[in-house]
A protein has these predicted regions:
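Extracytoplasmic ligand-binding site segments that recognize negatively charged/polar headgroups
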Residues: 131-135, 141-231
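Bacterial N-terminal signal peptides that target proteins for export
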Residues: 1-10
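Sec-exported extracytoplasmic/periplasmic mature domains
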Residues: 62-74, 92-96, 104, 136-139, ...
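N-terminal segment of the mature folded domain
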Residues: 29-168, 231-233, 244-250
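Ligand-binding pocket segment of bilobal, Venus flytrap-like solute-binding proteins
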Residues: 88, 189-281
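Extracellular/periplasmic juxtamembrane helices and adjacent flexible linkers that interface
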Residues: 25-27, 32, 40-44, 174-179, ...
Length: 370
């Protein structure tokens, strides 16, 4: 799906509202974000910036694009929401200038990306933080309490009916139907899958005997491509359950997840709580900011199934214009205005001021090798 020219802010006085299309769904973008984006340091002469990757970021990128293009009218941002794995591959192949990914580059990918960046450092910038919702479709039921091991058993296809005693034990006031559970997973390589399976591998114990992986590790009951595809599959069946970036949930039922002795519903604030409490990845350089999430937290305000999505870029580009465009656009993305635009449109958690300062310090160093 290509997100291009989502907004033409010919004049804010005339633009009472902006509707933008992302993956076939209309999104209303508050014109105030265009005004906020006017503080962006636009690139002289404009140009076209191409990115690809995370479908979880899709709606956020749409909001960023609309506001940024409104402020920098001679610049076009093209973002293809092909999924995190494909986005990383396109970046490594040099097909796009930046990538969006729900997982940071691993060691092998970093080596490949460094070669693509002609020997310059490649960095992971956590710019989009969102809960991963465990979403389901059961008539008359909007919310359920699910412990990590129960979620693991459901997606490992060991718990097969909604009125199973393990589900019923934590939902005594809910009349659970004798309906077959149909887990829905991503069919494509996905950072959302990698984050979700990383959580299960850490928190679900023996109920999830698989390692974290961007590819679903077992034979699926049902699978769909992209975040929108998973939501459509859940909506299309009764008894279905899946995992998806919270911005895509819509009217589906969602789970409150077991944390410590209680259950925590997803929210931007609850997602931010676990991110702020988690360290950066061991071995990061000064400019790299990949995060190691603490999935075993017992913090009662923290929602533990979180997607931290990154913008991946070279620290040096051969083409000066590309360097300027990446620097300008990513500066808006991590800015307070950009983060608020994303939060307003998707329910994502704005990054903290401390994180913003670190990311901006790295972005400020992006330049051209010639």
């Amino acid at each position: 799906v290509k997100l291009s020219k989502y907004g033409q802010f010919a004049g804010l006085a005339l633009a009472g509202s902006l509707a933008l299309s992302a993956c076939g769904s209309d999104q209303a973008v508050d014109p105030k974000h265009a005004a906020d984006a006017r503080n962006v340091d636009c690139v002289d002469g404009g140009g076209t910036l191409s990115g690809a990757g995370s479908s979880a970021q899709e709606n956020a990128v749409a909001a960023w694009t609309a506001a940024y293009e409104g402020a920098c009218g001679d610049t076009t941002i093209n973002y293809d929401a092909v999924g995190s794995g494909a986005g990383r591959s396109q970046f490594i192949d040099g097909a796009v200038t930046f990538a969006g990914s729900d997982a940071a580059l691993d060691k092998k990918e970093t080596e490949q990306a460094t070669e693509r960046c002609k020997g310059s450092e490649v960095v992971n910038l956590p710019a989009y933080i969102s809960p991963i919702a465990v979403a389901f479709n059961l008539d008359g039921i909007d919310s359920l309490n699910l412990k990590p091991e129960v979620i693991g058993d459901i997606f490992n296809q060991k718990i097969t009916k909604w009125n199973d005693e393990k589900i019923a034990a934590d939902n005594p006031d809910v009349e659970l139907p004798d309906t077959k559970i149909v887990p829905v997973n991503r069919s494509d390589e996905s950072g959302t899958t990698e984050n979700f399976t990383a959580y299960l591998a850490e928190a679900a114990g023996d109920a999830w005997p698989h390692e974290a992986d961007g590819n679903w590790p077992i034979k699926p009951a049902e699978a769909a491509q992209g975040s929108s595809g998973v939501v459509s599959a859940i909506q299309g069946g009764q008894g279905t359950i899946g995992y998806v970036d919270a911005s895509h949930v819509g009217g589906l039922g969602t789970a409150s997840v077991g944390v410590g002795d209680g259950f925590v519903a997803y929210s931007p604030e609850a997602a931010a709580a676990i991110v702020d409490a988690s360290p950066e990845r061991e071995g990061n350089t000064e400019n790299d900011h990949a995060i190691e999430l603490d999935y075993l937290t017992k913090e009662s305000s923290a929602y533990p199934i979180v997607l931290v999505s990154y913008e991946i870029a070279c620290m040096e580009y051969e083409d000066k214009k590309n360097a300027e465009l990446v620097k300008s656009f990513l500066s808006y993305v991590v800015s307070e205005a950009g983060q608020q635009a994303s939060s307003d449109e998707t329910g994502s958690a704005p990054i903290s001021s401390e994180t913003r300062d670190k990311l901006q310090a790295t972005i400020d160093k992006i330049g051209a090798s010639a």
